[in-house]
């Protein structure tokens, strides 16, 4: 479980394929604090550390993870949002984030407004995911508040600190991002769509 508060940016150092798996080597400032089998959020994807060497560590993504996330768009040199799993007793400064990406979204607009930035993203609403204004959304692992919610689009406002300390400053129109919708909202939507009989209520 994560909070969506990004700790640092990592850099993709190497990408190798092993049958249908993908091994990704990341350089980061928190590598010395990691251990084998530790869970780390990479752009919102929960991946397990399998190897550590100096300032680099390696994680492995299986075929399903690659298909459901923006991993296919990663390149050597890319900046990746990193967050280690939260501990019981930590402050929950963002919101509950599982590290399970629901779908890929696309950045369709970026505007600068009074020193901050507004990013608009498009997503596939037919998959059953929804956003609500003032609700929580995770974009590339970053906990954000929806400021404008449409049927297939939503917008978020990014303050300068978040812009500089996450990979939002690398986004352009067309950038593919990982989206994780609010877990509480997903359960409510699922329950609401079920046909309950009176005996089950």
Model-predicted segments: where are they?
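Conserved loop->alpha-helix
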Residues: 1-201
């Amino acid at each position: 479980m994560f909070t969506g508060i990004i700790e640092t940016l990592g850099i993709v150092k190497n990408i190798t394929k092993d049958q249908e798996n993908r091994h990704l080597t990341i350089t980061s400032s928190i590598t010395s604090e990691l251990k084998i089998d530790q869970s780390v959020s990479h752009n919102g994807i929960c991946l397990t550390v399998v190897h550590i060497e100096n300032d680099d560590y390696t994680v492995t993504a299986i075929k399903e993870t690659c298909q459901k996330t923006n991993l296919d768009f990663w390149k050597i040199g890319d900046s990746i949002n990193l967050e280690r799993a939260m501990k019981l007793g930590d402050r929950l400064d963002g919101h509950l984030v599982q590290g399970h990406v629901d779908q890929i979204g696309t950045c369709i607009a970026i505007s600068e407004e009074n020193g901050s930035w507004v990013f608009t993203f498009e997503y596939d609403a037919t998959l059953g995911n929804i956003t609500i204004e003032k609700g929580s959304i995770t974009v590339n692992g970053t906990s954000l508040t929806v400021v404008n919610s449409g049927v297939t689009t939503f917008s978020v406002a990014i303050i300068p600190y978040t812009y500089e300390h996450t990979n939002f400053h690398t986004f352009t129109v067309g950038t593919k991002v990982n989206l994780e919708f609010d877990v509480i909202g997903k359960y409510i939507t699922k329950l609401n769509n079920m046909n309950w009989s009176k005996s089950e209520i």
